[in-house]
UniProtKB/Swiss-Prot annotation:
It comes from Homo sapiens (Human). Residues 56-113 are extracellular. Residues 1-34 are cytoplasmic. GO terms for cellular component: membrane. The lineage of its organism: Eukaryota, Metazoa, Chordata, Craniata, Vertebrata. The chain crosses the membrane at residues 35-55. It comes from the Eukaryota. PANTHER family: CELL CYCLE CONTROL PROTEIN 50, CELL CYCLE CONTROL PROTEIN 50C. InterPro entries: CDC50/LEM3_fam. Keywords: Glycoprotein, Membrane, Transmembrane, Transmembrane helix. It is found in: Membrane. The keyword Metal-binding does not apply. This is Cell cycle control protein 50C.
């Protein structure tokens, strides 16, 4: 019986730091102070981003161009599937009433192709 106990002990892993390594456990400690700080910091960040987005959206200009009648020949050309390889171009010139900032370039006249 003693031989059997020795035989079982010899099959166990070595008791070394390499074989049986204990890693420290990392736990997050949430305190009320930390949670409230993160909550309010996130709220202030979102508020600032919202203000920036609202201010940048105010300077947006929208132009609506109706090209239904002007480019009607292209629509008729595409109704027939055999005309898939034929090219159709439609050009509509338009003008902006005021100056528009595009990066560092100011343009007062644009053309849509």
């Amino acid at each position: 019986m003693e031989e059997r106990a020795q035989h079982c002990l010899s099959r166990l892993l070595d008791n070394s730091a390499l074989k049986q390594q204990e890693l420290p456990i990392h736990r997050l400690y949430f305190t009320a102070r930390r949670v409230l700080f993160v909550f309010f910091a996130t709220g202030i960040f979102c508020l600032c981003m919202g203000i920036i987005l609202i201010l940048s959206a105010r300077s947006t200009q929208e132009i609506e161009i109706n090209y239904t009648r002007i480019c009607a020949n292209c629509a008729k050309l595409r109704e027939n599937a055999s005309n898939f390889d034929k090219e159709c171009t439609c050009s509509i010139p338009f003008y902006l009433s005021g100056k528009m900032m595009v990066g560092e370039i100011q343009e007062t006249r644009l053309t849509l192709h």
